[in-house]
Amino acid sequence: MPQSERHDTRERIVEATAAAFGARGYAGVNLNEVVKQLGLTKGAMYFYFASKDDLVCEIIARYAASLDDLTEPKRLSANPLEGLIKSSQSVIDDFLRNPISRAGARLAHERNLISASVADPNETWRRNVEALLRAAKRAKQIKSTVDEQRIADLLIDCLVGMQRASNDRKGASLSDQLQLFWKMALTGLQTQPADTPKKRSVKASVTRNGDSQHRAAIVTKKVSR
């Protein structure tokens, strides 16, 4: 089999299994069903992945890489608070659109069911959020008393909770929930006149892209004189 065909087959296996994991979870997926769905033999499946856990590790690794890319602090450092808000929306958008990310998020929560040792993909995300919060504090966009580690923990826990709850709700509501979260969180995070002469407010902008609706919270600055 040519290398390109082998790559395509491997990707088909990953994508089909990710869709199944995202819908039914680790315990609810039988690889025999995936093999049948794809029209492959068991031998073909195990040529690429020796076990179910190998597939899990592949999916979680891809999800972790996606989280790191979407929330990478250096790329967002020009305006760290805005970058933090926009990157959280990007994570939610990716979760809604990308079956591998949806499966990765679910499997991260079910790691205790997996015999292989799998790192928590949310840890890199958490570190990136902390870095953006530190940068926002240096830029006096948030209060000097903010504990970056605790706020990063809170943000990640809230977003992960939204992802888990989405299994019982329509996915479109996740963006609305995220906007509500930031509306409440920024009240406690942002600097007040006593901290800096600049007042900052946040507004939500809504843009449409085809049939999908993308919401991004954009930080705007108003300078009081």
Residue ranges and their predicted role:
Residues 58, 69-101, 148, 152:
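Hydrophobic alpha-helical connector segments
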Residues 43:
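Key DNA-contact positions within bacterial/archaeal DNA-binding proteins
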Residues 89-141, 164:
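Short secondary-structure transition hinges
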Residues 46-49, 53:
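A short His-aromatic
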